[in-house]
UniProtKB/Swiss-Prot annotation:
This is Two-pore potassium channel 1. One of its GO terms (biological process) is intracellular potassium ion homeostasis. A motif (Endoplasmic reticulum release signal) lies at residues 296-298. It is a multi-pass membrane protein. It comes from Arabidopsis thaliana (Mouse-ear cress). Residues 111-130, 225-244 dip into the membrane without crossing it. Phosphorylation at Ser-42 increases and stabilizes the interaction with 14-3-3 proteins. GO terms for cellular component: vacuolar membrane. Each of the two pore-forming region (also called P-domain or P-loop) is enclosed by two transmembrane segments (2P/4TM) and contains the GYGD signature motif which seems to be involved in potassium selectivity. The C-terminus (328-363) is required for vacuolar targeting. Residues 288-323, 327-362 form the EF-hand domain.
């Protein structure tokens, strides 16, 4: 009797089968949940789930789908608007005092715009000269404000115009190779300043040729005199013995003088930056090729645990190359400590949510 009781199961067989099926179902469900939790890289961000009203990390529209003017850099658009305002006000002011400006004149509005451009770019031919106290004070005000505006144009407009030609130059230098968009971006990133120098030099040569041809064809200058006038204009020397005298010539000069003088200044700026970049690359090459010593390992051990990890080694190398300094690292670490709400030494979704909650409460 006792042996039969021992062999008899405590639960019926059907009950055991049902429990086993439930256990298998729960185990599969929990394992699938674990798998879903491990796939954190593809999961939605916690801050998106926390606040649905805030749109974060929306991809910007593709540049090809944006109108041309809206594709411009906001700073460049602002400079263009200031330039248009400057030329409008300057033309109006110099037109009103046109009787107080002596020299060879053609049309009132064209002469006023031409004098405004010549003043802003500091070319100063001398073919139009203010001859009264009011006109001279006005010219002084516009020459200083114009130099400031030209400085902004140097750093904004020339970059925009040159970058449009960089991809074409890469294709031209590699005509025999199959260069796709990825290869072009990689090549531009590697030799960005070099291609900027090439593009600016090409634009400058075109402007020299166009200016010389125009002076020969329209202003009826000899070739040498036309080239001399182009050089004195682009370099803003403006001796004054050769200049634009016709109405069509001065209208052409309004656009040509501004473009060519800015282009030349930007070319020299790119050359200086290229020399600096070459020195920086030489330093990087030296850092990457020299052998690591024990002193280097001690300096790279940021947490002083006797072991240098990949992150510590990368930070040390970047500091040695001059890419970052101690201030950059301390600033990033301060941000990390602020986000690490539970002080675990790692960042999780809950840390970000708690940090956002705290910042919203403080507001």
């Amino acid at each position: 009797m006792s042996s039969d009781a021992a062999r008899t199961p405590l639960l019926p067989t059907e009950k055991i089968d049902t429990m086993a099926q439930d256990f298998n179902l729960n185990s599969r469900t929990s394992s699938s949940r674990k798998r879903r939790l491990r796939r954190s890289r593809s999961a939605p961000r916690g801050d998106c789930m926390y606040n649905d009203d805030v749109k974060i990390d929306e991809p910007p529209p593709h540049p090809s789908k944006i109108p041309m003017f809206s594709d411009l850099n906001p700073n460049l658009r602002r400079v263009i608007m200031f330039l248009a305002l400057y030329l409008t006000i300057g033309t109006l002011c110099f037109y009103l005092v046109r009787d107080q400006i002596s020299g060879h004149k053609t049309s009132g509005v064209v002469d006023a715009l031409y004098f405004c451009i010549v003043t802003m770019t500091t070319v100063g031919y001398g073919d139009l000269v203010p001859n009264s106290s009011a006109s001279r004070l006005l010219a002084c005000a516009f020459v200083f404000s114009g130099m400031v505006l030209v400085g902004h144009l140097l750093s904004r407009a020339a970059d925009y115009l040159v970058e449009k030609q960089e991809a074409l130059l890469v294709r031209a230098f590699h005509l025999r190779q199959s260069f796709g968009p990825t290869d072009i971006l990689k090549e531009l990133h590697t030799n960005k300043l070099r291609y900027k120098c090439y593009a600016t030099c090409l634009v400058l040569v075109v402007l020299f040729i166009v200016g010389t041809i125009f002076l020969v064809m329209v202003e009826k200058m000899p070739v040498i005199s036309a080239f001399y006038c182009v050089c004195s204009t682009v370099t803003t020397l403006g001796y004054g013995d050769k200049s634009f005298n016709s109405e069509a010539g001065r209208l052409f000069a309004v656009f040509w003088i501004l473009t060519s003088s800015i282009c030349l200044a930007q070319f020299f700026l790119y050359v200086a930056e290229l020399n600096t970049e070459n020195k920086q690359r030489a330093l990087v090459k030296w850092v990457l090729t020299r052998r690591i010593t024990n002193n280097d390992l001690e300096a790279a051990d940021l947490d002083e645990d006797g072991v240098v990890g990949a992150a510590e080694f990368i930070v040390y190398k970047l500091k040695e190359m001059g890419k970052i300094d101690e201030k950059d690292i301390s600033g990033i670490m301060d941000e990390f400590e602020q986000l690490d709400y539970d002080e675990s030494g790692t960042l999780t979704t809950s840390d970000i949510v708690l940090a956002q909650t705290t910042s919203q409460i403080q507001r």
